[in-house]
Amino acid sequence: MSGHSKWASIKHSKGKADKQRSKVFSKLSKEISVAAKLGDKDPAMNPRLRSAIQAAKSANMPKDNIERAIAKSSVNSETNYENLRYEGFGPDKIAVIVEALTDNKNRTASNVRSIFVKSGGNLGTQGSASHNFNQLGIIKIDKKEISDEQIFELAIESGADECISNDEFHEIQCPMSEIYNVKKNLEKTIANFISTEIEWVPLNSVDVEKDKVEAALEFLETLEDDDDVQSVYSNINFKNN
């Protein structure tokens, strides 16, 4: 659960602070349980579950927690979760997309709307903000796995559109429909991945006035802290602040 390096899409990393670890594990466990419930409990046969487990391992979630989350999918068979998306605009009119996984959409909608209103922003309708983004398949690989030169060539050969490297990881971009095919090709050479996710990538990032950056950050962090919210994306650009 991390940010998009090139376009400054905000998808804040969870779990870096000890005080957030419990909340992070709770959200990861929910995703694992839902993925296991909706598909095969064998990660090899369930791409969503495989990605959820990969994210959990990247967050240093204990193996026992992962196994309990998978087992929980059978115990809580009567609990139905929905994937929901909310769109709107926050401080300084930054475009925001919120992805949630909830068993009570009325509660989640009320909470998300309240956060938008308190920030001085507004929650819009479907499509009101998402036209500012593209959905892409994003595969992240630790720099220790492979060099910049090697990963670029491998990514293109594997069917990716682009590969961007920074100080920490390689980010491979591809059409969302091709993400698992691209990863399957990469797995012939690479064993360990940081994450494999569909992300909302801004078409253009926008600058926020310096005196509003703190408010924008607080708004995004408050959204992400909601128990039902899994991911938060924005087109805000922090590089010039």
Curated annotation (Swiss-Prot):
Chain positions covered by the region annotation Disordered: 1-24
Subcellular location: Cytoplasm
A GO BP entry: regulation of DNA-templated transcription
Primary location group: cytoplasm
GO molecular function list: DNA binding
Entry-linked InterPro entries: Integrase-like_N (IPR017856), TACO1_YebC-like_2nd/3rd_dom (IPR048300), TACO1_YebC_N (IPR049083), Transcrip_reg_TACO1-like (IPR002876), Transcrip_reg_TACO1-like_dom3 (IPR026564), YebC-like (IPR029072)
Highest taxon listed in the record's lineage: Bacteria
Classification via PANTHER family: TRANSLATIONAL ACTIVATOR OF CYTOCHROME C OXIDASE 1
NCBIfam families: PRK00110.1, PRK12378.1, YebC/PmpR family DNA-binding transcriptional regulator
Protein name as catalogued: Probable transcriptional regulatory protein SAR11_0592
